[in-house]
Design a protein with these regions (language model features):
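Catalytic phosphate/metal-binding cores of nucleic-acid and nucleotide-processing enzymes, i.e., regions
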Residues: 1-112
């Protein structure tokens, strides 16, 4: 199993948009697992209740910094882009490129 760092949108303007982004990220994680990969999606882990609040700027920055540190453990960053390319994903791309990590763009079949 190869390690992959999973990038997909998280933040949203409404609770519904965030919930849809979480649903999408979970589907992306399942896609990685079906491909025989071991994905890590820090935006799903660090935003759980009682951990960090994404809507609080300092906490979002802390979570992103921790996630980007973990991303160095994987030789590949996979970006799922059916729901767009968020500001956080842009930063993730910059970090991946700065560390010479391979970047792969993906879409989920049948995702609307």
């Amino acid at each position: 199993m190869r390690l992959v760092y999973l990038e997909s949108p998280y933040a949203g303007d409404t609770h519904e948009e965030i919930a849809e982004n979480v649903r999408y990220a979970r589907a992306c994680m399942a896609d990685c697992l079906r491909r025989g990969e071991a994905p890590f999606a820090s935006h799903l882990l660090y935003t759980q209740p009682g951990v960090l609040r994404d809507e609080v700027k300092e906490e979002r920055k802390l979570g992103m910094s921790a996630g980007f540190k973990w991303s160095r453990m994987a030789p590949v960053s996979v970006f799922y882009v059916d729901r767009g390319f968020s500001d956080g994903m842009i930063q993730g791309m910059e970090v991946a490129q700065a560390h010479g990590r391979y970047v792969e763009m993906r879409k989920l079949k049948g995702w609307k």
